[in-house]
A protein has these predicted regions:
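Conserved, single-site charged/polar hotspot
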Residues: 1-287
Length: 287
């Protein structure tokens, strides 16, 4: 979720058109681009239901679903009133590389099967119970970024995107082995690794044996890779994550004559709210 969102020091919000945080969702209209030039107009509460159903497992604890709803509402309010090149005629779109995930109720029901009635009610309750609630900083909606799971701690925004954002600092996150695919492995054939890396980092020297390609690793406060020396060149963990489709930048790496293997923990950019962390906190009774 929101993998491409990169906060800047000055939040890009038109403060003259932000909807008051305590408005009733049903009174707010959202224009949603669903592709092929089609734009739907939905009340905010109906839109939020579709976002939360797509962004977080409905099996999660009610308080986690509420947290996701507040994040989704805040994110949406921050988008409203801004002109975005990808969807100039709409406030938001359904492309997860630009905005938030989105699913129609009938598709959600197909996914949920016999749990449809319970899950529909849970998400409806999360939206209703947080009606109008948004996270603000200096009176305006924050950039409410989130991701799937952390490796014990979230990451400061400055350590991932290079811009310090006061409310996006690292905190402990209690999820762990209960998270599906919490640990993952990506094995890249040596020739594919060389071709892919050199296209991005042409100054890297990969002429020697693969076992000697990797040097010093610098890690951030959450244990993720800030940078690693590859063939004598410093490469960011985020760049390696993108190049080789790793689930996160929290990884170790080994190499032999046949493959470069990444052992990865967690999923996502690591900044903001961890969804599985929120669920773990909810199970502890946190609200």
């Amino acid at each position: 979720a929101q993998e491409s969102a990169a906060p800047t020091g000055e939040l890009p919000i038109d403060r003259t058109v932000v909807t008051p945080a305590r408005s009733e969702d049903a009174a707010v209209t959202v224009r949603v681009s669903i592709g092929d030039g089609e734009v739907l107009t939905l009340p905010l509460d109906k839109y939020l239901w579709r976002v939360v159903a797509a962004e977080m497992p409905a099996s999660f604890e009610p308080e986690a679903l509420k947290a996701q709803t507040v994040a989704a509402r805040t994110y949406t309010l921050a988008k409203m009133g801004r002109t975005v090149q990808n969807h100039p005629d709409a406030d938001v779109c359904t492309d997860i590389n630009c905005c938030q995930a989105y699913i129609e109720p009938d598709q959600a029901a197909e996914n949920w099967g016999e749990n449809t009635q319970v899950y529909t009610a849970k998400i409806s309750a999360a939206v209703a119970d947080t009606d109008g609630v948004a996270a603000l900083y200096d009176g305006a909606p924050i950039q409410a970024v989130f991701f799937s799971s952390a490796a014990g701690r979230t990451v400061d925004a400055v350590e991932v995107w290079g811009n310090a954002v006061p409310y996006l600092s690292g905190v402990d996150s209690p999820e762990g082995e209960e998270v599906p695919n919490y640990h993952s492995t990506a094995s890249v054939p040596v020739e594919e690794f060389k071709r892919t890396l050199l296209a991005k980092v042409p100054q890297a020297d990969l002429s020697g044996p693969p076992s000697g390609w990797f040097g010093e690793t610098v890690r951030n406060s959450a244990g993720g890779v800030s940078s690693v020396t590859v063939g004598g060149a410093a490469v960011t963990g985020s760049a390696l994550r993108e190049l080789f489709s790793l689930r996160s930048a929290n990884f170790t790496v080994t190499a032999d004559e046949s493959a470069v293997t990444f052992s990865v923990t967690g999923y996502g950019h690591g900044v903001g709210m961890s969804q599985y962390g929120a669920n773990a906190l909810a199970r502890q009774g946190k609200t």
